[in-house]
Amino acid sequence: MNINLTLFGQTIAFAIFVWFCMKFVWPPLTQAMQERQKKIAEGLDAAGRAERDLQLAQERAAQMLRETKEQAAEILDRANKTANAIVEEAKAQARSEGEKLIAGAKAEIDLEVNRAKDQLRAQVAALAVTGAEQILQSTVDGAAHNDLVAKLASQL
């Protein structure tokens, strides 16, 4: 056999093999690679979107947490203000009632003082009348008068 003829035959067989591969084997392989590349790109895009969505969800959660904390602080502040207002109102009401009680007690004391004064006046008048009667009934004697006045003074 001649090397040239063998070489020529192998070249033709190789060309047929290359043509067969290019016609029947290569298109499905390239199509499979393109589909796989497309799936990988879609997966990467989906992962990127999921990461962005996760980041947005975390930001929203953090924002909601801040807003909730602010609302809780506002509610506590309002509750404290309301409690302080109630306490101040109760203090004012207690002061008012205390002042009313003090005024009532002072009025009652004044009334009792006036009653006591009236009773004392009545007693002094009775004593004066009694003293005058005793002075008039007894004889005019300076020492006796002085004794009667001393007795009157001790009774007052």
From Swiss-Prot:
It comes from the Bacteria. Signal peptide: none annotated. It is a single-pass membrane protein. Belongs to the ATPase B chain family. F(1)F(0) ATP synthase produces ATP from ADP in the presence of a proton or sodium gradient. F-type ATPases consist of two structural domains, F(1) containing the extramembraneous catalytic core and F(0) containing the membrane proton channel, linked together by a central stalk and a peripheral stalk. During catalysis, ATP synthesis in the catalytic domain of F(1) is coupled via a rotary mechanism of the central stalk subunits to proton translocation. HAMAP family: ATP_synth_b_bprime. This is ATP synthase subunit b.
